[in-house]
Amino acid sequence: MSDRGRTLMVQGTTSDAGKSTLVTALCRWLARRGVAVVPFKPQNMALNSAVTADGGEIGRAQAVQAQACRLAPHTDMNPVLLKPNTDIGAQVIIHGRAVTSMDAAAYHDYKRVAMEAVLASHGRLAAAYRVVMVEGAGSPAEINLRANDIANMGFAEAVDCPVILVADIDRGGVFAHLVGTLELLSDSERERVKGFVINRFRGDIALLQPGLDWLEARTGKPVLGVLPYVSDLHLEAEDAIDTRQAAKVGPRLKVVVPVLPRISNHTDFDPLRLHPQVELSFVGPGQALPSADLIVLPGSKSVRADLAALRERGWDEAILRHLRYGGRLLGICGGLQMLGERLHDPLGLEGAAGSSAGLGLLALETTLEADKQLRNVQGRLSLEDAPLSGYEIHAGVTRGEALARPAVVLDDGRADGARSVDGNVMGTYLHGLFESTAACSALLRWAGLREVQAVDYQALRERDIERLADLVERNLDTGRLLALCGEPHA
């Protein structure tokens, strides 16, 4: 181990075992103790991303973990981000900037280059912070991905760090997951696993204890603790769409989101899931768009392909019918581009080069260009002059007469997005609209909700991060955790 900041890595036996949540919890727990801690994920594959203070993009899970550390997000926290744009390919983002798109086979060969970026970022963080809290990806026991691994044990071996292995007991088979994962590791990898965390346990811990005793005897490794199942924890999902909603009573505004094949940044809708006056529905393939007050076209990593999918499902006609009956329609980022008259991709940035007809609901045309726009912004919504904060992640340049009726006026003087002449259709490039309390309330009133209850989404997220840290204090072996971090136990 180096005398620089200590590194501790959390790996999982499966996807969705609880790695992101545990790293978030450990980050806030250490930050509350006054430890200078920073999150790190060598490689992330996700379509939910955040814009960083240094003008790049990283996975949204790392942005939440940065908040847990009380830090601004930085590209070094997630040096390699893969954003799938086909079933076999992805855009490769290194240190926050898109470098190329490649298929899985080509990326496998590229991993040696990616590892250089990973180690450079880790080195900078380890030099600046006392603890680097690392999140792995998927499982370390994927045999077909072991060669050139940069996301799990390949990274842990390269920087010589200890590993905690987390498993989800709620899905069943937790002992097989843990023991099986260890069996598939090399001797040196197995040695660096210093303990287990069992996640999402329901019931009487005394009934689990015989299994824990067996696990420790079988593996020679300690169980660092058992975290309870928490049903009302609402932090942003790393990739899968979270459809859970807060308990709601009384009249509600109906909001519908069509789920397109390459939907991106669906965390935009988390504030609506949690809003007590909103009934949010995600509608997938094979489903008709139900009646609604507001339809929101989400962001997309492949806008022309998603627009074709929308038409194949008959949703374009359903949207027009929705507008004829007085409904409201909002497009966010790729959704804004779909609302226009034409969409051009001359460079083939999101698939085959070419042009597509848009929905024709706003007098706009968009051309995709190589330089991606990445920025955090503040401004005011055209509705009620409501203040807002958000972020832009897009390659499109949009032009047209509808821009004379902007959806947002930014503090830097730029206008963003557009509104239709009748005011029923609106589009914006800004993600995170609903996270700003005043802007969210204004949009809900625009969509037909008369008496809107203001909800502070940022406060809710901060509350849940604090709850996670409390769970660490109550349920994990904090003495052993501090020792793994090189911190005194006081």
Curated annotation (Swiss-Prot):
InterPro entries: Class_I_gatase-like, CobQ/CobB/MinD/ParA_Nub-bd_dom, CobQ_GATase1, CobQ_N, CobQ_synth, GATase_3, P-loop_NTPase. The keyword Transmembrane does not apply. GO terms for biological process: cobalamin biosynthetic process. The active site is at residues 333, 431. Gene3D superfamilies: 3.40.50.880, P-loop containing nucleotide triphosphate hydrolases. The keyword Cell cycle does not apply. CDD domains: CobQ_N, GATase1_CobQ. GO terms for molecular function: ABC-type vitamin B12 transporter activity; catalytic activity. PROSITE patterns: GATASE_COBBQ. Residues 252-439 form the GATase cobBQ-type domain. Pathway: Cofactor biosynthesis; adenosylcobalamin biosynthesis. Keywords: Cobalamin biosynthesis, Glutamine amidotransferase. Belongs to the CobB/CobQ family. CobQ subfamily. Catalyzes amidations at positions B, D, E, and G on adenosylcobyrinic A,C-diamide. NH(2) groups are provided by glutamine, and one molecule of ATP is hydrogenolyzed for each amidation. This is Cobyric acid synthase. It comes from Pseudomonas aeruginosa (strain UCBPP-PA14). The gene is cobQ.
